Amino acid sequence: MNRFLSNATNRIDAKGRVSVPAAFRSVLTERNIQELYCFQDFVFPAISVGGLDLLDRFERQIAADDPFSPAANQMSLLIHGGGVFVRLDAEGRLMVTDFIRDFTGITNEVTFVGRADHFQLWQPEAFQALQAQAREERKLAGRRSE
């Protein structure tokens, strides 16, 4: 398994750390990801987390564009200005910093959400609400196509 799949909610400890789900840690190990690149998602109130390959993908998009274009500058603001590197501790925990809390609204628990090549950190109720909304919209889209 080399994809981040499913979701899990874990409690933040008294020191502000949260355990990354074992299934996600095994993907990180399998993909030899030791330093995590985190950025504020472009659409959702979530922090997207992946390896350097995730950052590289965005930087290739910027390089393919005119570096002085508004689109390239906006992308750089989002992925560089809205990104940080973090590491897991020896027990597989992630420090839930103000960078994460302020953008997501996370307080006591974190929902980890698999997104195939990366995962996201969500405030649990926000994830549940947006997942239910997405499910309902897909259901309605299916009815319209009949």
Curated annotation (Swiss-Prot):
Protein family (similarity comment): Belongs to the MraZ family.
Family annotation (NCBIfam families): PRK00326.2-4 (NF001477)
Assembly description: Forms oligomers.
Source domain of life: Bacteria
Organism placement in taxonomy: Bacteria, Pseudomonadati, Pseudomonadota, Alphaproteobacteria, Hyphomicrobiales
S-S bridge residues: none
Any GO BP: negative regulation of DNA-templated transcription initiation
One cellular component (GO) term of this entry: nucleoid
Protein name: Transcriptional regulator MraZ
Pfam family, one: MraZ
Residue stretches spanning the membrane: none
Keywords, ordered alphabetically: Cytoplasm, DNA-binding, Repeat, Transcription, Transcription regulation
Repeat keyword on record: yes
GO molecular function: DNA-binding transcription factor activity; transcription cis-regulatory region binding
Subcellular location, record wording: Cytoplasm, Nucleoid
Keyword Metal-binding annotated: no
Predominant location: cytoplasm
Domain SpoVT-AbrB, residue spans: 7-54, 83-126
